[in-house]
Structures are given as structure tokens and as C-alpha cells.
A protein has these predicted regions:
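Extended, low-polarity transmembrane helix blocks
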Residues: 1-25, 32, 41-49, 53, ...
């Protein structure tokens, strides 16, 4: 059963890791996309760091509750900034998907990382 907790952390983290890496290799496109929603360019680097560092910490189960809360807030924020054109079916799906992912992070925030984690080993 404990391995399912690890898999859950990996599954929730994967999309953020991939997106963070994609932003590095497509930095100019990332800036253009963010600016098209009036998000300032200076937020690109912190976004990339957040999308790579926090998921890695979640996967190993270190500072899980803090990472999960930060990622839940980040995920809800991105839903509200980038996915509110509900006339576009894909945007509606992305909005709802972000809310579902944030829900998973909130469950991690409440329950912690479980037995197979650095948090457990250090406690």
C-alpha cells in the first residue's frame, strides 16, 4: 500500500517536471506565452525553478507538506490566469484538470508523504 503513496507523488509531479524542463528548452516561447496573458517576464525563472525543484522534493518525500501546499496554490493560480476561456473546450478541461491536480496536492498537504519518504526517515 505504501508504494501507492510513492506512485501518487510521482504521478502528480511528472507534469510539472516535464513542463519546467520544456520551459528551459523553449524559453523564448515561454516568455511570449506568459506575456500574452500579461504575466511579467521576470516570473519565468521562478516558475521554472518551482516546476522542477518542488516536484523533485515531492518525489523523494522531503518537506512534502510545504511543497504540496505551494504546488496547490501555484496550480490554482495558473488555472485562474491561463485557463479561464470557458468557451474553448480545451481551456475548460485544463482548468478542471488543474483543480483536480490541486486537490491531489491538498490531500498530500493534509496527509503527508507516507512511509517511503525522507520526511518519514527524518522524523
Amino acid at each position: 500500500m505504501h508504494i501507492i503513496e510513492v506512485l501518487g507523488r510521482i504521478f502528480l509531479s511528472t507534469i510539472f517536471l516535464l513542463e519546467g524542463i520544456n520551459k528551459i528548452f523553449n524559453y523564448e516561447g515561454t516568455i511570449e506565452f506568459m506575456e500574452s496573458f500579461n504575466v511579467p517576464e521576470f516570473l519565468a525563472i521562478p516558475t521554472i525553478i518551482l516546476e522542477i525543484l518542488f516536484p523533485l522534493l515531492l518525489i523523494i518525500g522531503y518537506q512534502t507538506k510545504i511543497c504540496a501546499l505551494v504546488l496547490a496554490i501555484f496550480t490554482l493560480t495558473t488555472a485562474l490566469i491561463f485557463h479561464t476561456d470557458f468557451t474553448n473546450q480545451m481551456q475548460l478541461i485544463s482548468f478542471l484538470k488543474n483543480f483536480a491536480i490541486a486537490g491531489g496536492f491538498l490531500i498530500l498537504f493534509i496527509n503527508g508523504s507516507g512511509k517511503y519518504s525522507l520526511d518519514h526517515k527524518l522524523s
